[in-house]
A protein has these predicted regions:
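Bacterial Sec-dependent N-terminal signal peptides
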Residues: 1-13, 229
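Short, P/G- and charge-enriched loop/turn segments at secondary-structure junctions
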Residues: 3-5, 37, 317-320, 349-354
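A short glycine-rich, aromatic-capped structural motif
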Residues: 9-176, 184-195, 290
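Functional-site microenvironments in short loops/helix caps that host divalent-cation chemistry
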Residues: 17-18, 24, 29, 127-346, ...
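A short local loop/turn or secondary-structure capping micro-motif enriched for an aromatic residue
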Residues: 33-35, 302-304, 353-354
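Short, surface-exposed beta-strand/loop micro-motifs that present aromatic residues
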Residues: 39-41, 282-284, 354
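Short, structured beta-strand segments at or near domain termini in extracellular proteins/domains
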Residues: 359-375
């Protein structure tokens, strides 16, 4: 067909290519009791791009500001009609945040002489397509039936620093972590699974708006993709750095975690550390273990390895609000700054509920490769 666009592949900024391969998922250490429930399994994973670091406060703040500005433009009536006659936000229109029309963005009460955002109105709307339902329908219904609309509050829950730790003074983190420049390059926390997924849809929309050819969506990694990437090509490696130890030859810790009872700061960070702290693994990925645990797209099922497919393995379920709580569990991987070393192992599984926010859970995005291999482009 003539006049087809020339596809030269993509190389997204801040992402590294994870080549396709085969990986032996499951516990790498001699966890006999755990093996009874979660049996090891060999699977194949397609190639993909992955953020080399966790999403930082600075990166997530771009999303929050985009939502803030879109609301401000809406309140100001800054629209124009495109070539199809549809209304679009006029992003070139100047914004005056002192104008009376946009004061709904702020709370009436000031704190320390500053205006405070009304975070409850910072909402992002997007649509998803239910591919499983559409495949099961076999074309009998209109595709419109399978689109689902979502409205998600995007402002991080800064109160997690207080709520997660009773009888503990963490108010300075609640006040400053998401906004102070000192924490710009630290991983964003206080985001639930829905917020992390919404960030991916916004990022995809932003990418496609400035590129002639649309790409695949930026999304959360599946559990299998995360484990494969964390291992860095090292088969049966218990940690991303390969060896069975959490300290190097000099006795220095190799990740940000809790090495002993009541011992948080030995690695140099009482809480989180910058997203590019410590050495990357052999794929070039930082902090795949430690710092913050990370959301995956996968639903948590205890014995998933006994029934998942051996190609691009995944368990996907869209839990509704009225579903049983157990159905709302999503796999988190990597362990965090407040966890012991067991949770840092590449084969260790854990979960959080999809609608909960934590001070120790963040995320990063992946992008599926289009084509056979990145080396083809």
């Amino acid at each position: 067909m003539l006049e087809r666009p020339d596809w030269k592949g993509v190389n997204p900024y801040g992402m590294v290519y994870v080549r396709p391969g085969t990986v032996h998922i499951g516990n790498s250490d001699q966890d006999i009791t755990g093996t009874f429930i979660q049996r090891p399994k060999s699977i194949s994973i397609s190639g993909f791009y992955m953020d080399d670091t966790e999403i930082s406060n600075n990166e997530y703040r771009q999303f929050v500001f985009w939502v803030r500005d879109s609301i401000a433009h809406d309140l100001m009536g800054d629209y124009y009609a495109d070539e199809n006659g549809e209304e679009r936000i006029d992003w070139e229109a100047p914004l005056d945040f002192s104008a009376p029309e946009v004061q709904d963005l702020y709370l009436e009460t000031r704190f320390a002489g500053r205006k405070l955002y009304n975070a409850n109105i910072f909402k992002y709307d997007y649509k998803t397509f239910d591919w499983d339902a559409a495949a099961a329908d076999r074309g009998r219904s209109s595709p419109e039936r399978f689109f689902e609309e979502h409205t998600i509050e995007v402002y991080p829950d800064t109160m997690v620093w207080i709520r997660d730790f009773a009888y503990s003074y963490n108010e300075p983190m609640a006040r400053n972590y998401f906004w102070h420049p000192a924490y710009d390059n630290y991983p964003v926390v206080g985001v639930n699974w829905h917020m992390a997924r919404a960030f991916g849809y916004w990022r995809t929309s932003l990418w496609n708006s400035v590129n002639e050819i649309s790409t695949e969506e930026f999304r959360l990694p599946t559990e299998a993709e995360y484990e494969y990437a964390a291992r860095g090509g090292r088969e049966h490696a218990p940690y991303p750095w390969g060896g069975p130890y959490v300290r190097n030859a000099k006795g220095c810790l190799l990740a940000n975690f809790k090495p002993g009872r009541g011992n948080y700061p030995e690695d140099g960070g009482q809480y989180t550390v910058p997203v590019d702290a410590y050495y990357p693994n052999d794929f070039g990925l930082y902090n795949m273990s430690g710092n913050v645990a990370e959301w995956t797209s996968t639903a948590f099922v205890e014995n998933a390895n006994s029934f998942i497919h051996d190609m691009n393995s995944d368990v996907h379920y869209e839990a509704d609000e009225d579903d049983p709580e157990a159905w709302k569990r999503k796999v988190v991987r990597g362990g965090s700054w407040k966890d012991v070393s067991f949770y840092l192992q590449t084969g260790t599984r854990s979960y959080e509920f999809q609608d909960t926010t934590k001070s120790y859970v963040g995320f990063r995005n992946v992008l599926s490769l289009m084509g056979r291999s990145a080396s083809d482009f």
